[in-house]
Regions:
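Short, well-ordered alpha-helical microsegments
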Residues: 1, 61-62, 83, 130, ...
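ATP-dependent carboxylate-amine ligase
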Residues: 1-22, 31-37, 48-52, 68-73, ...
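Phosphate-binding loop of NTP-binding sites
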Residues: 7-13, 31, 44-47, 56, ...
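Short, polar loop motifs at secondary-structure junctions
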Residues: 20-23, 41-43, 56-60, 80, ...
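Short, glycine/acidic-enriched loop or turn micro-motifs at the edges of active sites
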Residues: 22, 148-150, 174-175, 210, ...
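Short loop/edge segments at beta-strand edges and connector loops
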Residues: 39-41, 77-79, 123-125, 206-208, ...
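Acidic, glycine-rich loop-and-beta core segments that form the ion-binding/anion-interacting portion
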Residues: 242
Length: 397
Protein backbone atom coordinates (compact mmCIF):
# COMPACT_ATOMS: atom_id res chain seq x y z
CA UNK A 1 0.00 0.00 0.00
CA UNK A 2 2.94 2.32 0.65
CA UNK A 3 4.21 1.80 -2.89
CA UNK A 4 0.70 2.34 -4.25
CA UNK A 5 0.51 5.62 -2.34
CA UNK A 6 3.79 6.74 -3.90
CA UNK A 7 2.54 5.81 -7.37
CA UNK A 8 -0.60 7.89 -6.83
CA UNK A 9 1.54 10.80 -5.64
CA UNK A 10 3.79 10.52 -8.71
CA UNK A 11 0.67 10.69 -10.89
CA UNK A 12 -0.19 14.05 -9.37
CA UNK A 13 -2.77 13.06 -6.76
CA UNK A 14 -2.81 14.52 -3.28
CA UNK A 15 -2.27 11.52 -1.02
CA UNK A 16 -2.77 10.86 2.68
CA UNK A 17 -2.40 7.54 4.44
CA UNK A 18 -3.09 5.72 7.66
CA UNK A 19 -1.66 2.52 9.13
CA UNK A 20 -1.40 0.97 12.55
CA UNK A 21 2.39 1.32 12.58
CA UNK A 22 4.73 2.58 9.87
CA UNK A 23 8.39 1.58 10.10
CA UNK A 24 11.54 2.37 8.10
CA UNK A 25 12.29 2.03 5.27
CA UNK A 26 8.65 2.65 4.24
CA UNK A 27 8.19 5.58 6.63
CA UNK A 28 11.32 7.20 5.17
CA UNK A 29 10.09 6.62 1.60
CA UNK A 30 6.68 8.12 2.35
CA UNK A 31 8.25 11.17 3.98
CA UNK A 32 10.63 11.71 1.07
CA UNK A 33 7.68 11.47 -1.34
CA UNK A 34 5.84 14.18 0.58
CA UNK A 35 3.05 11.85 1.71
CA UNK A 36 1.48 12.69 5.07
CA UNK A 37 0.33 9.71 7.11
CA UNK A 38 -1.19 8.96 10.48
CA UNK A 39 -0.42 6.04 12.76
CA UNK A 40 -3.43 4.47 14.42
CA UNK A 41 -6.99 3.97 13.21
CA UNK A 42 -8.79 6.48 15.43
CA UNK A 43 -11.77 8.19 13.82
CA UNK A 44 -10.06 11.57 14.26
CA UNK A 45 -7.47 10.51 11.65
CA UNK A 46 -9.97 10.68 8.80
CA UNK A 47 -9.02 13.08 6.00
CA UNK A 48 -11.55 14.39 3.50
CA UNK A 49 -10.79 12.71 0.18
CA UNK A 50 -12.43 11.86 -3.14
CA UNK A 51 -11.63 8.17 -2.79
CA UNK A 52 -10.40 5.86 -0.04
CA UNK A 53 -8.15 2.97 -1.07
CA UNK A 54 -8.49 0.11 1.42
CA UNK A 55 -5.73 -2.44 2.04
CA UNK A 56 -6.46 -6.12 2.55
CA UNK A 57 -5.25 -6.01 6.17
CA UNK A 58 -8.20 -3.76 7.09
CA UNK A 59 -11.25 -5.57 8.49
CA UNK A 60 -14.76 -4.15 8.38
CA UNK A 61 -14.53 -3.75 12.16
CA UNK A 62 -11.79 -1.13 11.77
CA UNK A 63 -12.88 2.09 13.50
CA UNK A 64 -11.59 4.42 10.80
CA UNK A 65 -13.21 2.35 8.05
CA UNK A 66 -16.50 2.41 9.95
CA UNK A 67 -16.35 6.21 9.99
CA UNK A 68 -15.58 6.33 6.26
CA UNK A 69 -18.57 4.09 5.53
CA UNK A 70 -20.81 6.06 7.89
CA UNK A 71 -20.01 9.18 5.89
CA UNK A 72 -20.86 7.23 2.70
CA UNK A 73 -17.49 7.91 1.11
CA UNK A 74 -16.29 6.07 -1.99
CA UNK A 75 -14.05 3.09 -1.18
CA UNK A 76 -12.01 0.90 -3.52
CA UNK A 77 -9.42 -1.85 -3.09
CA UNK A 78 -5.77 -1.28 -3.97
CA UNK A 79 -5.72 -3.71 -6.92
CA UNK A 80 -8.97 -2.27 -8.30
CA UNK A 81 -7.62 1.29 -8.11
CA UNK A 82 -4.41 0.21 -9.80
CA UNK A 83 -6.25 -1.41 -12.70
CA UNK A 84 -8.69 1.45 -13.22
CA UNK A 85 -6.01 4.13 -13.19
CA UNK A 86 -2.99 2.45 -14.79
CA UNK A 87 -3.11 -1.23 -15.76
CA UNK A 88 -6.11 -0.90 -18.05
CA UNK A 89 -3.87 0.95 -20.52
CA UNK A 90 -0.79 -1.24 -20.18
CA UNK A 91 0.57 -4.59 -21.34
CA UNK A 92 0.60 -6.39 -18.00
CA UNK A 93 3.21 -9.04 -17.23
CA UNK A 94 2.08 -10.69 -13.99
CA UNK A 95 4.45 -12.89 -11.98
CA UNK A 96 2.64 -15.37 -9.73
CA UNK A 97 3.37 -18.36 -7.54
CA UNK A 98 3.93 -19.34 -3.93
CA UNK A 99 7.61 -18.38 -3.94
CA UNK A 100 9.94 -16.23 -5.99
CA UNK A 101 7.50 -13.54 -7.13
CA UNK A 102 9.57 -10.64 -5.85
CA UNK A 103 12.85 -11.99 -7.21
CA UNK A 104 11.55 -12.80 -10.70
CA UNK A 105 9.59 -9.53 -10.96
CA UNK A 106 12.69 -7.53 -10.03
CA UNK A 107 14.78 -9.55 -12.51
CA UNK A 108 12.37 -8.75 -15.33
CA UNK A 109 12.41 -5.03 -14.49
CA UNK A 110 16.21 -5.07 -14.18
CA UNK A 111 16.70 -6.84 -17.52
CA UNK A 112 14.33 -4.48 -19.33
CA UNK A 113 16.06 -1.40 -17.91
CA UNK A 114 19.47 -2.74 -18.94
CA UNK A 115 18.08 -3.18 -22.46
CA UNK A 116 16.98 0.45 -22.76
CA UNK A 117 13.35 0.02 -21.71
CA UNK A 118 11.69 2.18 -19.07
CA UNK A 119 9.17 -0.34 -17.72
CA UNK A 120 6.42 0.33 -15.25
CA UNK A 121 6.77 -2.03 -12.32
CA UNK A 122 5.51 -2.73 -8.82
CA UNK A 123 7.65 -4.99 -6.61
CA UNK A 124 6.83 -6.15 -3.08
CA UNK A 125 10.43 -5.78 -1.97
CA UNK A 126 13.39 -3.45 -2.31
CA UNK A 127 15.62 -4.25 -5.32
CA UNK A 128 19.23 -3.43 -4.51
CA UNK A 129 20.15 -1.97 -7.90
CA UNK A 130 16.93 -0.12 -8.67
CA UNK A 131 16.17 3.22 -7.05
CA UNK A 132 12.78 2.16 -5.75
CA UNK A 133 10.22 -0.66 -5.63
CA UNK A 134 7.97 0.93 -8.26
CA UNK A 135 8.14 2.91 -11.45
CA UNK A 136 5.59 4.76 -13.58
CA UNK A 137 6.46 5.70 -17.15
CA UNK A 138 5.00 6.03 -20.64
CA UNK A 139 6.27 2.55 -21.55
CA UNK A 140 3.49 0.11 -22.51
CA UNK A 141 4.83 -2.67 -20.25
CA UNK A 142 3.84 -3.02 -16.59
CA UNK A 143 5.54 -5.80 -14.58
CA UNK A 144 3.76 -6.74 -11.37
CA UNK A 145 3.65 -9.43 -8.71
CA UNK A 146 0.37 -11.31 -8.92
CA UNK A 147 -0.53 -12.34 -5.41
CA UNK A 148 -3.03 -15.12 -4.64
CA UNK A 149 -3.93 -13.54 -1.28
CA UNK A 150 -7.34 -11.90 -0.95
CA UNK A 151 -8.03 -8.38 -2.19
CA UNK A 152 -10.00 -6.53 0.46
CA UNK A 153 -12.65 -6.96 3.16
CA UNK A 154 -15.40 -6.64 0.53
CA UNK A 155 -13.62 -8.65 -2.19
CA UNK A 156 -12.22 -12.00 -1.11
CA UNK A 157 -10.94 -12.94 -4.55
CA UNK A 158 -7.16 -13.08 -5.07
CA UNK A 159 -5.57 -9.78 -6.05
CA UNK A 160 -4.39 -11.21 -9.38
CA UNK A 161 -7.93 -11.22 -10.81
CA UNK A 162 -7.82 -7.42 -10.93
CA UNK A 163 -4.61 -7.19 -12.96
CA UNK A 164 -6.04 -8.84 -16.12
CA UNK A 165 -2.59 -9.90 -17.35
CA UNK A 166 -1.53 -10.15 -20.95
CA UNK A 167 1.26 -12.48 -19.87
CA UNK A 168 0.87 -14.60 -16.74
CA UNK A 169 3.91 -16.41 -15.37
CA UNK A 170 3.20 -19.15 -12.81
CA UNK A 171 6.45 -20.02 -11.07
CA UNK A 172 5.04 -22.61 -8.66
CA UNK A 173 1.89 -23.50 -6.72
CA UNK A 174 2.07 -24.95 -3.22
CA UNK A 175 -0.17 -24.83 -0.19
CA UNK A 176 0.15 -21.57 1.73
CA UNK A 177 -2.02 -18.86 3.32
CA UNK A 178 -3.72 -21.35 5.62
CA UNK A 179 -5.74 -18.49 7.13
CA UNK A 180 -7.83 -18.19 3.95
CA UNK A 181 -7.28 -21.48 2.07
CA UNK A 182 -8.18 -24.94 3.34
CA UNK A 183 -6.06 -26.86 0.84
CA UNK A 184 -3.97 -26.53 -2.31
CA UNK A 185 -6.97 -27.40 -4.48
CA UNK A 186 -8.63 -24.12 -3.47
CA UNK A 187 -5.53 -22.21 -4.55
CA UNK A 188 -5.31 -24.11 -7.84
CA UNK A 189 -8.98 -23.38 -8.49
CA UNK A 190 -8.32 -19.64 -8.34
CA UNK A 191 -5.38 -19.93 -10.74
CA UNK A 192 -7.57 -22.02 -13.05
CA UNK A 193 -10.36 -19.43 -12.97
CA UNK A 194 -7.87 -16.64 -13.69
CA UNK A 195 -6.51 -18.47 -16.72
CA UNK A 196 -10.05 -19.08 -18.01
CA UNK A 197 -10.70 -15.32 -18.01
CA UNK A 198 -7.63 -14.49 -20.09
CA UNK A 199 -8.40 -13.44 -23.67
CA UNK A 200 -6.95 -14.49 -26.99
CA UNK A 201 -3.54 -12.96 -27.73
CA UNK A 202 -2.65 -13.42 -24.06
CA UNK A 203 -0.18 -16.03 -22.82
CA UNK A 204 0.27 -18.22 -19.74
CA UNK A 205 3.75 -19.54 -18.92
CA UNK A 206 3.91 -22.34 -16.34
CA UNK A 207 7.00 -23.77 -14.67
CA UNK A 208 5.99 -27.35 -15.42
CA UNK A 209 7.80 -29.20 -12.62
CA UNK A 210 6.54 -26.79 -9.95
CA UNK A 211 2.78 -27.38 -10.32
CA UNK A 212 0.80 -30.56 -9.76
CA UNK A 213 0.12 -33.07 -12.51
CA UNK A 214 -3.63 -32.81 -11.87
CA UNK A 215 -3.49 -29.03 -12.35
CA UNK A 216 -1.60 -29.44 -15.63
CA UNK A 217 -4.01 -32.06 -16.91
CA UNK A 218 -7.05 -29.97 -16.03
CA UNK A 219 -5.65 -27.04 -18.00
CA UNK A 220 -4.81 -29.21 -20.99
CA UNK A 221 -8.39 -30.50 -21.15
CA UNK A 222 -9.96 -27.04 -20.90
CA UNK A 223 -10.86 -25.02 -23.99
CA UNK A 224 -8.95 -21.82 -23.36
CA UNK A 225 -8.74 -18.58 -25.33
CA UNK A 226 -5.25 -17.88 -24.04
CA UNK A 227 -2.07 -19.61 -25.22
CA UNK A 228 -0.73 -22.11 -22.71
CA UNK A 229 2.99 -22.88 -22.54
CA UNK A 230 4.60 -25.30 -20.10
CA UNK A 231 8.25 -24.53 -19.40
CA UNK A 232 10.75 -27.32 -18.84
CA UNK A 233 13.78 -25.66 -17.26
CA UNK A 234 16.87 -27.84 -17.21
CA UNK A 235 18.53 -26.56 -14.05
CA UNK A 236 18.49 -27.42 -10.36
CA UNK A 237 19.90 -24.03 -9.38
CA UNK A 238 17.08 -21.78 -8.16
CA UNK A 239 18.88 -18.57 -9.17
CA UNK A 240 19.42 -19.85 -12.72
CA UNK A 241 15.82 -21.05 -12.83
CA UNK A 242 14.55 -17.60 -11.88
CA UNK A 243 16.66 -15.99 -14.61
CA UNK A 244 15.24 -18.38 -17.21
CA UNK A 245 11.70 -17.62 -16.05
CA UNK A 246 12.39 -13.91 -16.41
CA UNK A 247 13.72 -14.48 -19.93
CA UNK A 248 10.62 -16.44 -20.97
CA UNK A 249 8.31 -13.75 -19.56
CA UNK A 250 9.72 -11.07 -21.88
CA UNK A 251 10.79 -13.20 -24.84
CA UNK A 252 8.39 -11.24 -27.07
CA UNK A 253 10.32 -8.05 -26.26
CA UNK A 254 13.97 -9.09 -26.12
CA UNK A 255 16.00 -12.23 -26.75
CA UNK A 256 16.98 -14.68 -24.03
CA UNK A 257 20.64 -13.79 -24.60
CA UNK A 258 19.95 -10.09 -24.01
CA UNK A 259 17.95 -10.86 -20.87
CA UNK A 260 20.73 -12.98 -19.39
CA UNK A 261 23.32 -10.36 -20.30
CA UNK A 262 21.11 -7.73 -18.71
CA UNK A 263 21.08 -9.73 -15.49
CA UNK A 264 24.84 -10.04 -15.13
CA UNK A 265 24.93 -7.14 -12.67
CA UNK A 266 21.74 -8.19 -10.85
CA UNK A 267 22.44 -8.39 -7.11
CA UNK A 268 19.04 -9.28 -5.74
CA UNK A 269 16.43 -7.86 -3.41
CA UNK A 270 16.74 -6.90 0.22
CA UNK A 271 15.82 -9.77 2.55
CA UNK A 272 16.15 -12.32 -0.26
CA UNK A 273 19.30 -14.31 0.53
CA UNK A 274 20.91 -11.07 1.71
CA UNK A 275 24.29 -11.22 3.44
CA UNK A 276 24.08 -8.65 6.24
CA UNK A 277 27.33 -9.57 8.04
CA UNK A 278 30.49 -11.24 6.78
CA UNK A 279 34.00 -11.65 8.19
CA UNK A 280 36.56 -14.44 8.39
CA UNK A 281 34.62 -16.28 11.11
CA UNK A 282 30.93 -15.68 10.38
CA UNK A 283 28.45 -14.97 7.62
CA UNK A 284 24.91 -13.89 8.56
CA UNK A 285 22.24 -14.26 5.86
CA UNK A 286 18.76 -12.74 6.09
CA UNK A 287 16.10 -14.43 3.97
CA UNK A 288 12.36 -13.86 3.55
CA UNK A 289 11.69 -17.61 3.20
CA UNK A 290 8.59 -18.54 5.20
CA UNK A 291 7.55 -21.78 3.51
CA UNK A 292 9.37 -25.14 3.78
CA UNK A 293 10.20 -25.27 0.07
CA UNK A 294 11.73 -21.80 0.10
CA UNK A 295 13.74 -22.66 3.23
CA UNK A 296 14.98 -25.88 1.60
CA UNK A 297 16.06 -24.03 -1.55
CA UNK A 298 17.92 -21.43 0.50
CA UNK A 299 19.71 -24.09 2.54
CA UNK A 300 20.64 -25.89 -0.68
CA UNK A 301 22.40 -22.77 -1.97
CA UNK A 302 24.37 -22.47 1.27
CA UNK A 303 25.28 -26.16 1.27
CA UNK A 304 27.03 -25.63 -2.05
CA UNK A 305 29.50 -23.41 -0.17
CA UNK A 306 29.70 -24.78 3.38
CA UNK A 307 28.41 -27.46 5.73
CA UNK A 308 28.88 -25.37 8.89
CA UNK A 309 25.37 -23.95 9.11
CA UNK A 310 23.14 -22.72 11.92
CA UNK A 311 19.49 -22.24 10.94
CA UNK A 312 17.10 -19.86 12.69
CA UNK A 313 13.46 -19.91 11.54
CA UNK A 314 10.79 -17.48 12.67
CA UNK A 315 7.35 -19.09 12.60
CA UNK A 316 5.62 -15.85 11.70
CA UNK A 317 3.46 -16.55 8.65
CA UNK A 318 -0.17 -17.60 9.12
CA UNK A 319 0.55 -21.06 7.72
CA UNK A 320 3.60 -21.53 9.95
CA UNK A 321 1.72 -20.42 13.07
CA UNK A 322 -1.11 -22.82 12.30
CA UNK A 323 1.31 -25.73 12.19
CA UNK A 324 0.39 -26.93 8.69
CA UNK A 325 4.07 -27.28 7.76
CA UNK A 326 5.34 -28.83 11.01
CA UNK A 327 6.07 -32.27 9.56
CA UNK A 328 8.17 -30.88 6.71
CA UNK A 329 9.94 -28.50 9.07
CA UNK A 330 11.03 -31.39 11.29
CA UNK A 331 12.73 -32.99 8.27
CA UNK A 332 14.50 -29.70 7.51
CA UNK A 333 15.52 -28.94 11.09
CA UNK A 334 17.26 -32.26 11.71
CA UNK A 335 20.01 -31.59 9.17
CA UNK A 336 21.81 -28.79 11.05
CA UNK A 337 21.83 -26.88 14.34
CA UNK A 338 18.41 -25.23 14.36
CA UNK A 339 16.57 -22.66 16.47
CA UNK A 340 13.00 -21.40 16.21
CA UNK A 341 11.43 -18.04 17.02
CA UNK A 342 7.76 -17.70 17.96
CA UNK A 343 7.00 -21.43 18.06
CA UNK A 344 3.87 -22.40 19.98
CA UNK A 345 4.15 -24.64 23.04
CA UNK A 346 2.87 -27.53 20.91
CA UNK A 347 5.40 -26.81 18.17
CA UNK A 348 8.24 -26.67 20.70
CA UNK A 349 7.32 -30.24 21.68
CA UNK A 350 7.15 -31.37 18.05
CA UNK A 351 10.51 -29.80 17.19
CA UNK A 352 12.23 -30.57 20.51
CA UNK A 353 14.51 -33.34 19.21
CA UNK A 354 15.89 -31.28 16.32
CA UNK A 355 15.35 -27.62 17.28
CA UNK A 356 14.91 -25.37 20.28
CA UNK A 357 13.28 -21.99 20.84
CA UNK A 358 15.91 -19.26 20.61
CA UNK A 359 16.91 -17.40 23.79
CA UNK A 360 19.40 -14.64 24.55
CA UNK A 361 21.78 -17.23 26.04
CA UNK A 362 21.76 -19.20 22.77
CA UNK A 363 23.05 -16.16 20.88
CA UNK A 364 26.37 -16.28 22.73
CA UNK A 365 26.74 -19.95 21.77
CA UNK A 366 25.75 -19.36 18.14
CA UNK A 367 28.26 -16.52 17.85
CA UNK A 368 31.15 -18.52 19.33
CA UNK A 369 33.99 -19.10 16.88
CA UNK A 370 34.45 -22.54 15.31
CA UNK A 371 37.53 -23.89 13.59
CA UNK A 372 35.63 -23.43 10.34
CA UNK A 373 33.73 -20.31 9.23
CA UNK A 374 30.08 -20.53 10.25
CA UNK A 375 27.05 -19.41 8.23
CA UNK A 376 24.01 -18.30 10.21
CA UNK A 377 20.80 -18.33 8.15
CA UNK A 378 17.75 -16.46 9.47
CA UNK A 379 14.49 -17.23 7.64
CA UNK A 380 11.14 -15.52 8.15
CA UNK A 381 8.75 -12.84 6.89
CA UNK A 382 8.56 -10.86 10.14
CA UNK A 383 11.17 -9.04 12.25
CA UNK A 384 12.72 -11.89 14.30
CA UNK A 385 11.52 -10.27 17.55
CA UNK A 386 14.75 -8.30 17.90
CA UNK A 387 17.00 -11.38 17.84
CA UNK A 388 18.67 -10.43 14.57
CA UNK A 389 19.86 -7.15 16.07
CA UNK A 390 21.20 -9.01 19.12
CA UNK A 391 23.10 -11.45 16.89
CA UNK A 392 24.58 -8.58 14.87
CA UNK A 393 25.66 -6.87 18.09
CA UNK A 394 27.32 -10.08 19.30
CA UNK A 395 29.10 -10.66 15.99
CA UNK A 396 30.42 -7.10 16.00
CA UNK A 397 32.05 -7.46 19.43
Amino acid sequence: MGNLAQIAKAMGHEVFGCDNKVYPPMSDELNSSGINFFQGYEEKNIVDADIYVIGNAISKENNLLKEILRLEKKVVSGPEWLYQNILSNKKVIAVSGTHGKTTVTSMIAHALINNNFDPNYLIAGIPKKLEKSWNISNDEVFVIEADEYDTCYFDKRPKFFHYRPNILLINNIEFDHADIYENIEMIEKNFFELIKTMPSKSKVLINEKKVSKSFRNKLKKEKLKTTLQFLSLNTSNIHEENKLLAAHAIEDLISKEKVLNGLKDYIGVKRRFETIFNNKNFKLIDDFAHHPTAIEETIKMIREQTDNLTLIVELGSNSMKRGVHDKRLVDIFKNQETYTINASAEQEKIFSVHAKELTNDDIVKICSKDEKKKTILMCGNRNFHGFQKLILNQLNK
